[in-house]
Amino acid sequence: MFCVGLGGQDTSLSSSSPFLPCYVVKNPEFKLTNCCSMGVTTLVELQLHDAKKYVEATYHPVTSMSEAIQKLKVFTSTHDLDYVDGIMFSKTQGAIITGRMTDTISSGVTTQSFSDAKDPWFYLHVQDKIASITTPYTEAIPLAEYLFRYDRGGFWVGKSAFDYFKFPFNKLTRWWLDDFLHTRMLYTALHASGQSKKYVVQDLALPYSTAEEFVNYTDETFGIWPLWLCPLKQDSIPTMHPHSNEFEADGKTLKQMLNIGLWGFGPQNHADFIKANRNLEHKLRELGGMKWLYAHTYYSENEFWQMFDRKWYNNLREKYGATSLPSVYEKVKVDIEAETKAEGKKTLLGSLATMWPFSGLYGIRKAIASKTYLAARKAEWRTYGKKLE
């Protein structure tokens, strides 16, 4: 088995050059701006490095966001860890999770799996482990199961389905409904149901210096917990990814940023939902942060390009003959005016289709029809751990 490493190349199709090799080292600007606005990736070549059988994962309890940030800084400054992320369950409870690949499990360390329907969801398991301890707890997880540890439950978005239907949320119901609770099924149901227009799905990157203030804001405004924490290493190359201009003491190295995953129900009224998202974008901007562009984006075009180097981006589109393709802004923006008009023109039947529980039931129907649960059942990562026994 192998893990993906950095480097390699991909091949993209653009209007000026049928096949354009894009080496990470030689053409880094292409990799950092593409978003299918420069061309369409048709072939990917990856550099690999040897993987190990297990990840020894350690859960470090924290009691505040400031403590979480300090631990993230410490753990990302060392080179003997392979993985670092974190979960804040509330303002006073969280865990920073570190991982180290190994073929040999340390003495006294037990193994844990997350692939079977009877297994716990990862985030619930971590919360359970740190509930009664003040010191780090370590266990070994088969590598493939660690890499897909958030698949069952879709991080914690799956709990929202239980909340929506007012259905009991416990070990028995999670086991019974396991087919519906993998990321692909949840994603399909969310969008088919129309609930994505009422659900906040945002990854937001900020300087460490303003991350705690931002979390205080999201708590007061949305009340969404848990939050996912993921440290981000910056690159000096211009990019369409989140970035900031804060430097380390040497004046050359860009400081890391912190990605905060904010996923949960927002205001149910459409106008209030848009307003809440716009306010979120303004607060993010105020604190020197940026959002990842996979998510709903409500910026005006002028606001959007204030965050990025438009001239540099357009020059690249000219260079690669990609001006006939939609720009990044055109791909990610939400047409607020069109959505508002559509809301106002809904028929009685259309309104009923978006109401509880009909929209949710329709989402489930479409998710079942997609048969993505069959792919989840056959996923190789779910059997990897059993091969190690």
Range-by-range predicted roles:
Residues 1-389:
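Noncatalytic alpha-helical scaffold of FAD-dependent oxidoreductases
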